[in-house]
């Protein structure tokens, strides 16, 4: 066997074509390209949303944030703040966008306070639909909201009317994951009681939250057990902290109280690790549900109404359209020139 032949055959496995290597090709391409994910966090002020997000991704997304005083909250309106950070771990890049909603639920009158949030979600669908219909489809940035952590106060006896209204208004647009904040303010018994109450109310009100898919039959038993535990933990009761404290002779992230220490990453203390595991292991599924269900529903409605409407805050100028068309024209001209050069070479070799 020649050296060149050996490079393209596998003598150890006769009849092997190579299709089994296709997943590796997809993996390498995905790693080179990197991943995009958009997470929205919604909930009243003071529930530790920013702290939890910083704890989840070991980063500081809000270094310059100023917390408004009580007087400023009375007439405060909902703002939309999107922060993007590039995270790299073992050669894998993640472009994470966290959409925060300061002002939600703070004002005395909270009627329609969630409408700016719904407008933002719809606007990202509009952007994506517009980009899909454009010339430069290869380089579409996906800013659609793939998941929404909805923070529920631990101080009530279940869902507030605003919680119900918001989730029902958004559940056909975004994957909602309910989170009970500040779990360290509850005893274990109170925690379980509140979880059951929230789940019962979600079912009674017909609210559609994100349901983890069942593990496949060919998955290993550890993964099946992990999936079962994650499903049983919804809604997740969490504690966030960026402070390192000493517990049992080691440094851990947690909160120090006169009665003891609450460790953020201790599954016996709260569901922080389960929430992070759910997000990481089901990130692809969250994106697929967004694409195949929520976005397709939005797209179908838009097409029924006669195509994409105007996108808020996005001005497609004539100059931009001309630049796109000129770039496309240049690519076509270059392709034609290459084809002509190849034909000329073939013609010359034929004459010889």
Curated annotation (Swiss-Prot):
Region: Important for dimerization, residue numbers: 259-269
Top-level division of the source organism's lineage: Eukaryota
Q: Give the span(s) annotated as G3 motif.
A: 100-103
Write out the residues that bind GTP: 43-50, 77, 103, 182-190, 240, 255
Keywords on record:
Cell cycle, Cell division, Cell membrane, Cell projection, Cytoplasm, Cytoskeleton, GTP-binding, Membrane, Mitosis, Nucleotide-binding
Region: G4 motif; residue ranges are: 181-184
Q: Where in the cell is it found?
A: Cytoplasm; Cytoplasm, Cytoskeleton; Cytoplasm, Cytoskeleton, Spindle; Cleavage furrow
**Keyword Cell division set for record:** yes
Q: Which Pfam families match?
A: Septin
Query: For the Septin-type G domain, which residue ranges apply?
Result: 33-305
Site keyed Important for dimerization: positions: 155
Q: Name one GO molecular function term.
A: GTPase activity
Which SUPFAM superfamilies has this protein been placed in? P-loop containing nucleoside triphosphate hydrolases
Keyword Cell membrane part of the UniProt annotation: yes
Sequence segments annotated as region (G1 motif): 43-50
GO CC entries: cell division site; ciliary membrane; cleavage furrow; cytoplasm; microtubule cytoskeleton; midbody; septin complex; septin ring
Q: What PROSITE patterns does its record include? A: G_SEPTIN
InterPro entries, per this entry? G_SEPTIN_dom (IPR030379), P-loop_NTPase (IPR027417), Septin (IPR016491), Septin2 (IPR008113)
Task: Enumerate the Gene Ontology biological process terms.
Answer: cilium assembly; cytoskeleton-dependent cytokinesis; protein localization; smoothened signaling pathway
Q: Subunit details for this protein?
A: Septins polymerize into heterooligomeric protein complexes that form filaments, and associate with cellular membranes, actin filaments and microtubules. GTPase activity is required for filament formation. Can form heterooligomers with other family members and form filaments. Interacts with wdpcp.
The Swiss-Prot or TrEMBL record describes its family as follows: Belongs to the TRAFAC class TrmE-Era-EngA-EngB-Septin-like GTPase superfamily. Septin GTPase family.
Q: What does this protein do?
A: Filament-forming cytoskeletal GTPase. Required for normal organization of the actin cytoskeleton. Plays a role in the biogenesis of polarized columnar-shaped epithelium. Required for the progression through mitosis through regulation of chromosome congression. During anaphase, may be required for chromosome segregation and spindle elongation. Probably plays a role in ciliogenesis and collective cell movements including convergent extension during gastrulation.
Please give the name of this protein.
Septin-2B
Q: What is the lineage of its organism?
A: Eukaryota, Metazoa, Chordata, Craniata, Vertebrata
